[in-house]
Amino acid sequence: GWDEILQGGIAPNATVMSWRGEEGGIAAVTSGHHAIMTPGAYCYLDSYQDAPYSQPEAIGGYLPLKKVYAYDPVPASLTAEQAKLVYGVQGNLWVEYIPTPEHVEYMIYPRMLALAEVAWSAPERKSWPDFHTRALSAVADLQKKGYHPFDLSKEIGSRPESLQSVSHLALGKKVIYNSPYSSHYPAQGNTALTDGIRGD
């Protein structure tokens, strides 16, 4: 069951699906239970897979192919014996924002290919450049067969500048109105454009 089952007493033969992070899976295997690792940060394929402004509306989040491929489902904190209790990984897709089968294909491919390699490849044998080349080829092949994958060859990628805060030079400066604001719509008077709530 979902990792919430750890909160109410877990059945002796239960397997835990760790979706809220890795903590549930770690707790499960350290207490002798099996776990399936499916944390949202790496395995929820209903998140945006490219720059959100370039994608169909999604539930939120940003999960590009490279991040899926980088996932290691066996946390480093586990012993070799505990690691044997990790059954593997699972990809998830909630369809509130995915109205058609074609859109499902778009959201899962090629990220599901990356998740498959995460499942069957030892981390030390993985190569992102090699996989990326193969994923480009796989996307072209899927398209030829009539599927609707995300076109990896047109990936925009993350926008690092969007992750940096911007502090503009006008903040806190005196504002001089060239035309007085209307007395019928005074808002916050002279502070309406400088209080950080109403505008710049």
Model-derived features with residue positions:
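Disordered, acidic Ser/Thr/Pro-rich linker "stalks" and the adjacent N-terminal cap
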Residues: S162-D200
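Substrate-binding groove of N-acetylhexosamine-processing glycoside hydrolases
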Residues: G1-S165, V175
